[in-house]
Amino acid sequence: MAATDNAAEQVAHIAEKIRAGKTTLGIEFGSTRIKAVLIDDNFQTIASGDYSWASHLEDGLWSYTTEEIWGGLQSAYAPMANDVETAYGEKLTHVGHIGFSAMMHGYLAFDEAGELLVPFRTWQNTNTSEAHKKLSELFQYNIPERWSIAHLYQAVLNKEEHVSKVAYFTTLAGYVHWKLTGKKVLGVGDASGMFPIDPTTHTYETAFIEKFDALPEVAAQPWKLENLLPEPLVAGTPAGELTEEGAKLLDPSGALKPGIVLAPPEGDAGTGMVATNSVRVRTGNVSAGTSIFAMVVLEHKLKALHPEVDLVTTPAGDLAGMSHANNFTSDLNAWVGLFGQFAKAIGQPVDAGMLYGTLFRAAIADDVDANCGGLLNYPFRSGEFLAGLPEGRPLFARSPEANMTLGNFMRAQLFSAFSPVKIGMDVMTKQERVQVDSLVGHGGIFATPKVAQKILAAAFNTPIKVMSTAAEGGAWGMAVLANYLWNTNEDHSNLADFLDGCVFKDAQSTTEKPVASDVVGFEDFFARFTKGLPIEHAAIETINLEDK
């Protein structure tokens, strides 16, 4: 009876918080899922909703339609709001603050009337190699292929008809925020994936803007770059209010009222840093999903230009080095799905948790070979700059004498998933001697205890911490950033202290240290992985991208 009373009291307590607006909502657009998370003022998730989606090829480029964006947003919000009403008896009419986050980079370009000029070009597209090379050389600063400025400049170089009409361009998070508030702003972390940010002023690098505008093909355009970019805002800055039109876009039922103050819209790198408490200098995180990035907050700028390392900022505006790989779980999920089909075919269907857990644990069983027994896998569904691949073809290969076991197979899947991101991380830690006090892993792959954590420790030869919030991901991190609007000081300089002292003060974590034999095994696998990349090039030449 006491337990029932306590549960009822807890529900009543949370219902009161919902009525009082002591909640914040974070919504993140990932590559395969849009997730909405509502948290209370103790940073606990009290309701959530999600919607699955996938990019598609449009004229040879990866894209999502605006109908998919808005339909997906509403389809993630609705079950969260329903969750609130079902669990706590409250119709969700208001929340304290809202924040939107999304996969970074890409290209959403609009004319003066606010009309989309070309289909959304996502970060997955690697058709911007010429722009990447020319801008990196011009700035002496790495401009990756997926950055928004590379997409704009490539369109200029291609003499695309829409370029002269561009009045504004932004990221996915910036687009959603703009349509819901009317404000053309962007969190500084997301902005740093559009165009380089000065970590001192937290604005765009003016010298680079001047160099860009001076390029003859750019000077011929009717616009100046600074007039096209969203305004960067550091975490804790109010970023506009939900308009009446915006409220209806988010919640077509009309229950949600306008006037809610929004946080600056951020990128998935920034929300990953927040979700892992990795915004302080010499800390880092590995955010793993459809793509993967490893990030370290830097003490100072890197000594040299490294194409393998992106320089972005934390949501507070501090410089961070990032190794980003386009490909991570897509190929892995396809193989796991195949095993799931087999289980169903023999009349023994298993749920996703058991399926992934069983297969993942096989990868670290006592009888596996540390180097995967001669098995080799390439997880490239799309192009991969780090590996020099313009397109992707998932591949599995082995020598005739390889030790083909389930454990070795799954180990090869996981090793290969972490291999592309290792390329850039090795540049930072081995060439630039970047010091890392801690690395925290987050994302759904870490939900199975120890497995991905242990393999990542071997890949980077460094201890990997996973926190109790590991599977919360970016939507929760965005909700925390929205909560920070209540806690910030005037100069917004204490995000790291806020996370340490408020959000993560009681957080539980586990740490896996690298095992010497695993490190040696990974390095052996990685050497074969690198040596075998010509196999991937041959596949690109001989297998059509859209073959079915």
Give residue ranges: language-model regions:
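N-terminal glycine/serine-rich phosphate-binding loop of ATP-dependent small-molecule kinases
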Residues: 1-118, 134, 165, 226, ...
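Active-site core segments that coordinate phosphate-bearing ligands/cofactors
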Residues: 6-19, 25-26, 133-186, 195-219, ...
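Short, basic and Ser/Thr-rich N-terminal targeting/leader segments
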Residues: 20, 30-33, 94, 101-103, ...
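Glycine-rich, flexible loop/turn motifs
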Residues: 47, 57-58, 106, 113-119, ...
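Short beta-strand-loop/turn "lid" adjacent to the catalytic site in phosphate-handling enzymes
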Residues: 85-122, 144, 177-189, 193-198, ...
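Carbohydrate-associated surface elements
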Residues: 125
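Gly/Ser-rich phosphate-binding catalytic loop and adjacent alpha/beta segment
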Residues: 128
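ATP-dependent phospho-/nucleotidyl transfer catalytic cores
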Residues: 223
